[in-house]
A protein has these predicted regions:
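Bacterial Sec-dependent N-terminal signal peptides
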Residues: 1-28
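Alpha-solenoid HEAT/Armadillo-like helical repeat scaffolds in large eukaryotic proteins
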Residues: 138-142, 156, 168-176
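Hydrophobic core positions within HEAT/HEAT-like alpha-solenoid repeats
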Residues: 154, 186-187
Length: 241
């Protein structure tokens, strides 16, 4: 028992020391983290959908799934709301992510997760694929109204491989150039479609090479921004669905 307690105390000490070694981001960096991890909440049947979600309890596999009869009773727009605010599958990340310094000065290789330790089920991603045109239209409608693209919308766009939304996203990005994760969406779309000029670039090797990880990034500056926009526009012009 004493050995167990000593081991636990040592682990706790190591954890505290590791926390002390974490960087201490600026307020601007922390504010940007809040901005980039914000989920867009659609208004369609929102109160009804939230009430349904509030009654869910995880099953033995930690899945919080709306029963099929209730899910099928929802309209398309209500299903859109449900899927955009609720991930059904539990996927715990055991490794805590340390704070990121100067997060607002980076273009990341990957998007942050929309639902913490949960993610979309196959049923939910299938909804996006089966109703692709409607989902894209609803995302555009919501973004036009709110003037922002939530991380859940970005994840859905990448999941659907929605290349056709590139011009719209670029227009949104150029309004204030604040949301650098829109540039990440462009990178992920080019990667998913194996766009050779991008795959052959040094930035691709840096972002998605053998040494890449969840936090891999390139510096946000005018040169990198313009290069991504130029490449994604060339990709879009030559894309054949």
């Amino acid at each position: 028992m004493r050995m167990l307690m000593a081991g636990l105390l040592m682990m706790a000490s190591l954890f505290v020391n590791a926390q002390d070694e974490y960087p201490k981001p600026s307020k601007e960096s922390l504010d940007y983290n809040v901005y980039r991890t914000k989920v867009s909440v659609p208004p369609y049947g929102l109160a009804k959908v939230k009430a349904m979600i509030a009654k869910l309890t995880p099953n033995d596999e930690e899945i919080e799934k709306l029963p099929d009869n209730l899910y099928n009773s929802l309209s398309l727009r209500e299903k859109f709301t449900y899927n955009m605010i609720h991930g059904e599958i539990y996927s715990q990340n055991c490794d805590p992510m340390p704070p990121v310094e100067d997060e607002h000065k980076k273009i990341f290789a990957q998007l942050p997760g929309a639902f913490d330790e949960y993610s979309w089920s196959d049923k939910q991603t299938q909804f996006f694929d089966n109703n692709r045109d409607s989902v894209i239209a609803l995302i555009k409608e919501s973004v036009t109204r709110s003037k922002r693209v939530g991380v859940n919308y970005k994840e859905a766009i990448v999941s659907m491989n929605a290349v056709e939304i590139i011009p719209f996203l670029e227009e949104v990005y150029l309004r204030d150039k604040k949301d650098h994760d829109i540039l990440t969406v462009f990178l992920l779309l080019m990667k998913a479609n194996k766009y050779q000029p991008f795959l052959a670039s040094s930035s691709f090797k840096k972002l998605y090479g053998d040494d890449a990880n969840y936090g891999t990034h390139i510096v946000y500056n005018s040169a990198n921004e313009q290069l991504i926009l130029q490449r994604v526009n060339d990709f879009y012009k030559n894309y054949k669905r």
